Amino acid sequence: MPFGAVYRATRVAAIALVAVAATPPRTEPGLLSPAGSTSSLPPSALSVWTGRAWREWWRSDAAPDRWTAPHDAIADAIQWKRAADGVEWGELRLAGAGEARRLRAVAVRIDPRLVRLRLDTAFTAGGERAAWTVEGARADAIVAVNVGQFIRTLPWGWVVLDGREFLAPGRGPLSTAVVVDSSGGVRWIGPDGLADPAVRRGVAAAFQSYPTLLTANGDVPDALRSPGRGIDVEHRDARLGIGALADGRLLIVLTRFDAFGESLGSIPFGPTIPEFAALMGALGARQAVALDGGISGQMLVREQNGTTHAWRGMRRVPMALVAFCHPERDVCHPERQRLSSRAAARDLL
C-alpha cells in the first residue's frame, strides 16, 4: 500500500478510536457462555444485539473450555440468508470493550458437498508482490475469501494447488491445515499430522494457518485461556477464521469495525483471539483456525441472482479460497435445469 494511503488509513483509525472510546457501552447482563471455565484471561465481555436490546453472552472470567453446540443468544440473533445451493450467510452486531465497542460479524456457511472448492493465487507480473483482492475474484465465485497467513509475498506453511505441492508444511504447535481432497471432501490436520506422508496423498488443495482457535472436539487451546502461553490474548484486531460445523459444513467468519458503518469497516479494530474463538464456537464450530485478518481480511458472497456483497480489505494478499457452483449440478447450468423442470412437469401429466 502506498505510504500516503497507509497514513490516511492510520489517521482515520485514530480518529475512530477516539470516537469509540467516548461512546458509552450499551450492554445488558444476560445468558453467559457454557460453564466449565478455568480461564484467567484479562477482563472482557461480548454482547450481541437481539433486535431489541444488547444481550451479554460471553465473559472472560466465565469463558468455556469447550464448545459443544451453538450459543442460544448467537443462534437467535443471526438471520441466515440463502446465497446459492449449499451457501448461506448472515450478520451479527456485537459489542465489546475499547476499540471493539461496536463490531459486525459476517458469517458464511458452506456445504462442500454442494459446491466446488479451490485455491486461487495472484501475484504481480514479476512475483514481487501479492495481488489478490475480492475485486479480482473469479466471476463465477459464490464465496471468495483470503486464507492462510503470509510472510512478505508468499503464504506461510503448506500449500497445495491443483494437486501439486506449492510450499512445504510449516511448523508450529498451534497450526492447522485445511485440506480439500480429490473427491471434494474437507478434512483438518493438526500440527503433528503433516509429518506422515500418507496424510498428504490424494490432496487437491490445501493451506495451513495459525493459531488454532478450536481443536477437533470444540476444545479451546490452553494458549488461548490465559496469558503467557505464546499468544497475545489482549491484542485487538479485525479477525477472520474458518471452522467446521458438526454436520461437516464450513463456517467462515469475518469481523468488521461497525461504529461508523461499512465505509470504515476495514479499520483493523476487533476482538481478541480468545473472544474470536468464542464467537466461532458460539456459531457452532467444532474445529477452527484463524486466518490473516487485520487489514488483509476480505470476503465476497455472490447470490444466485447476481447480487454481490463484498467486504474489502486494505491490503492485497497472495491466496484465497473460492467456492463456486459444482459443475455436475443442474443448478449450475440454467438450460439443463429448465429441461429437467420440463421433464418433471411432463411426468406429472
Walk through the language-model features, giving the residues of each:
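Zymogen propeptides
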Residues: 23-172, 176-177, 185-188
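A cross-taxon signal for low-complexity, glycine/charged-rich
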Residues: 4-8, 335-339, 346-349
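Bacterial N-terminal signal peptides
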Residues: 12-20
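Short, solvent-exposed aromatic-acidic interface loops
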Residues: 122-128, 192-196, 254-260
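Active-site-adjacent helix-turn-beta-strand microarchitecture at beta-sheet edges
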Residues: 148-234
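Leucine-biased recognition of intrinsically disordered, low-complexity hydrophobic segments
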Residues: 17, 31-32, 41, 339, ...
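A short, polar/proline- and glycine-enriched secondary-structure boundary/capping micro-motif
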Residues: 128-132, 197-203, 261-270
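Conserved, well-ordered active-site substructure
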Residues: 154-172, 176, 180, 228-287, ...
